[in-house]
Amino acid sequence: KWPELETSLIDQDLENIFEKIKTIISLANSARMKAKIKRRWPVTEMAICSILDKETLVQSNNNNNTRKYYDYDHNQFDTELSKNDISEILKNQLNVHSYKVKQIHTSNTVEKVLEMINAHLPVLPLISIIRKNVAPQVKSDIGKVISEFEKIDKVDVLYTLKTDKKFRLFYNKASSFSSSSSSSFIDLYEKDLEISFSVKEGYVYAEKENLMIFMSTNRDQNLITQGLVRDLARNLQQLRKEKSYNPTEILSTAYIADLEKDEVSSLSLHTTDLTYLVRVQSIVLSEEKKEDIEYKIIEIDGREISISIN
């Protein structure tokens, strides 16, 4: 008889968390591809941002009759990822030293960009005038209007749009009867502006549905060395397979040659990790090949390195 599903044993909350984690990992991998950072290479930090539509939340709260959107716990998403030891699992899967979780509530682009700024995410607002919407109102002064708008602090524009639903822009209007000009203004609404954001230098991001990932692309020497350790371990593991060694057998020595002097020094701090990953008793690092050792030449990031194992 086939076993029957015991639904009472299913932890639906835990299932939902892992579904969310799958999406997070997929987005993180997309961000890595943009930055050309391999999955094996550790990165210093990531920010995971969950976007919640206000209307959806209000409808949900009306159905539950429990709380309004502005009472929503901003740390709930972080709590979900922290319980049941999920945090360490996610950190390992993302291959990141640390991550933070943010949650923003938004109903339009203005609020989305503002919320990201207020959440201290690495973004900069991008706002420009939609010429075809504004030109009919200011006619020949469109150039002056655009020029004046470029001088304005874009965060101030966002706050004003959120509170007043419009932004009043003052500019010098050309006179039809003389060379002088007079002060004038135009009220700009969200429909008159193209609003988006860019990611600050040193970061890359990926977005899907209601999730965004911001990943630091800055890699110091320690992170670069850790990435090299992962690459070398993978190639030495492959060499073990090619030589048909028993996967559980602890071999004598792994050799890594054609290294730079500083690489020998930095990798020597990670020999414990390498011996564990490759299952050998010792690691020999050198700038030049050792005599009487048969090496295999591999390529890592466009350069040749020689490895051997026995």
Language model segments and positions:
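Feature 926 captures the class I aminoacyl-tRNA synthetase adenylation module centered on the KMSKS loop
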Residues: 1-310
